[in-house]
Each structure stands twice: as C-alpha cells, then as structure tokens.
Amino acid sequence: MTDQKVPNVIERPLPNGVIYDMSTVGRVRITLPESSTWLSGLHWHETHDEYLKVVRGTVRVRLGDSRQVISAVNGNQPEIKVPCYAWHEWQRAAPEGEEVVVIERIEPDDNDKAIFFWNLNGVILNSPKLLSDETSIVSRLPARLQGLFLDTWIPLNLFIIFRSLDNIPVFLNAPNLSRVSDQRLRSLLQKIHTVVSHLILLVALWAGWLLGLQPVQLKYTPGDAYATWKSRQVNFKKAA
C-alpha cells in the first residue's frame, strides 16, 4: 500500500467523535468536536514519557490520583507531563462548548504514537467491512455469529497493538485506587492490576501469533513509517 492510500488525518463520527491528525512527525493532534463522548481510557506507558498540550478548549485529566481541569485560555497552551507508569486518561471537560484540541507527543520520539493511532483506527474502522466482503468467510456467517466475531476480533487486534506499542490499559481499576488510603494495600492492588493487564495482553499476543496477526500492518501505516518501525524491530532483535 502506498503512502497516498493511508491518510494522515483520520476521523471517527459522533457520539465518540474524534479527529486524529498525524501530518506532523513526532506528534498527533487530536480534535474532539462538541458533544463528543470520546475518552482515552485509563492506561499507562512503560517505555515512554507522554506530553499532553491543550491547544484549544478545556479537558478533564486524570493523572495518578489527581484529577484536574485544564484550559487553553488567551493564548496560553498548557502542557502536562505523563511520566512512565503513571495511570492517566483524558476527555472533554463538558459535552457543550467549543471543540477541544490536544497535541500528544512522546519521549523518546520514535513515532510510535502515530503508528499506534494509524493501526488502532485501521482495525476499528476496517474490521466491520469484513461483514460485507464477499471474499471473506465472515460475510457468510449468520448475523449473530458475525457480531460475536467482531466482538472478539477487534479487541484481540487492539490488545496486540497495545502490547506492542507501549499502551497498557487498566482492565480492573476496582476498587478505585485513589480511594484506598492504606499505602501497602494500594501498592498491592496496583501490582495486581499491573499483572492482570500484562497477562491479558500476553494471552492476546500468543493468540495473535497463532493466527498470524501483526500489531503494525502496512495496509494501515504509511510506507516510510512502516519501514522505519520494521527496521527498529529487526535491530532490536539483533541487539537482544
């Protein structure tokens, strides 16, 4: 697939409407239109620090135990740092009001952020097309089985992407750790959450390996970005 066939700007419709702009290397510009219910989901990174810069509008951010509302006002565009292993998520502060624009970037800047969003959206937007593809076995399944297939296929592919591109979801978050006052209990619960998340993603990775699934696919990724990512993987394996 050529670069021209892989868009740098990807839009998903309401109610969880969002626009991902990967036009500038090293950052992803995320736009949330009015009334969007989009939520990043609670997660953490283990090999990257992340930076969230609020360019327009107001967002609600959870970072560790803190919850804050951050606005871009009068030309001020605040940026917050999300250190490795810090649980975090963000969304619009309110459904009404102007559109929200946030720039996400990571350090080290290896372009994994853009590759993550290209492939995440590729899976989410293209998997349902299998149902109408006459060459696909899935299109011949009964409607109930088609729904079951998508409910399994999409999360499986996403979990493989999460595992390989440093985006670890918090699957449990019960009880909410911020409400646990005992430090030893909180530490134990967080370790349990960490083990559960890694175990789920590892099982998904094994299942994906058996099925021949890849976290980064050329059909969803611009050719130059794919080649660079693939080269890094080869070099990493040689170094290991």
Task: Please state what every model-predicted region is.
Residues 44-61, 65:
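Short, conserved beta-strand element in jelly-roll/cupin
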Residues 51, 63-89:
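Short acidic-glycine-tyrosine-enriched beta hairpin
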Residues 94-185:
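Double-stranded beta-helix
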Residues 188-240:
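C-terminal non-catalytic accessory extensions
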